[in-house]
From Swiss-Prot:
Compartmental location: Cell membrane
Main location, first listed in the record: membrane
Enzyme class at the top of the EC tree: oxidoreductase
Any one GO molecular function term: metal ion binding
Annotated gene: ctaA
GO CC terms, sorted: plasma membrane
Topological relation to the membrane, as annotated: Multi-pass membrane protein
Role description: Catalyzes the conversion of heme O to heme A by two successive hydroxylations of the methyl group at C8. The first hydroxylation forms heme I, the second hydroxylation results in an unstable dihydroxymethyl group, which spontaneously dehydrates, resulting in the formyl group of heme A.
Positions contributing to heme binding: H255, H308
Organism: Anaplasma marginale (strain Florida)
PANTHER family, A to Z: CYTOCHROME C OXIDASE ASSEMBLY PROTEIN COX15, CYTOCHROME C OXIDASE ASSEMBLY PROTEIN COX15 HOMOLOG
Family indicated by similarity: Belongs to the COX15/CtaA family. Type 2 subfamily.
UniProt catalytic activity: Fe(II)-heme o + 2 A + H2O = Fe(II)-heme a + 2 AH2
Name the UniProt record assigns to this protein: Heme A synthase
Reported cofactor(s): heme b
Amino acid sequence: MKAHFGVTVWLGVCCSMTLLMVVIGGITRLTHSGLSITEWQPIVGVVPPIGDEAWLREKEKYAQTPEYRHRAADISLDDFKRIYIIEYIHRLFGRALGAVFCLPIPYFAITKRINRAMVAKLLMVALLGGMQGAMGWFMVKSGLVDTPRVSHYRLAGHLFLTILLFSILWHSFLRCAGVRSTTTTTNARFFTAAAVVGLTVLQMVLGALVAGLDAGLTYNTFPLMDGAIIPQSLFSAKLWHGGFLHDVTAVQFLHRLVAVLIVVCAAPLPFWLKTRGAWLFLACVALQFLLGVATLVSVVHIFLAAMHQVFGFVTLAAGVHMLCRLRREGSTCISGHAGIS
């Protein structure tokens, strides 16, 4: 039995908006627009600057940032407006997504279209959404102090919260849409499939570290790095003393290594599980791998990089869908009507 049609559509819209938010966030980062707005004003920040005087005030605030001093000291007002508008759209769309998600919850709860367990789950998602907004500002603040870029650790945390939010929303949508656990498989194969999906999440977080360090701008060949599969600089004592995850070479190598590991581990899944979901997941993994290579050799072309980022979420969605279709030996079938009373 499926959940109320309106609830299913609403969750589908929220998932779609989250993916679009990922695209906008990626473009914001790739165009170096994220530090153009130097204040966090959740309410009054809805209104953009109006008139040249207001724009000049915003540009003066931007002039106090490390990014301006190191990278954009000669930026014109028109160019500043361009990067400001990109970040403004990023923040405004985040507010819109929050409203679209939060406002219908009381209505669905009062009209009994969702049960208490689903209400609690959705309120947890709303709380995570608030944390995501705060984490976004916490990330931006790291680029307003000393260095002209945000902390790659905070960027990874920002992305991880998005991954968590999207996964919960997508799983809820699948259950409300009537997706059921219909294919029985062994515990070993089920947990192997789950581990590959977990590796996908790890790889997405590693991608955020790569992006935060601008590591994609170096070693723009594949499969070799500086003429070798394993670059010699990985064996440098300086690297290990300075911090492995602070090093551009180490982080990019890890990202490459996990990408290959995911492909190798995902390849046998369709033959083990014998489901269309496993084939879809493998196809997404393969395409995402090719997008990653294309992004690297293009020296992070904006379109390819944005597609690579959002397709990571598409691959994750395919993985969650694959797992939702599986039932372990000895377990009872999980019905697809979570969310209704």
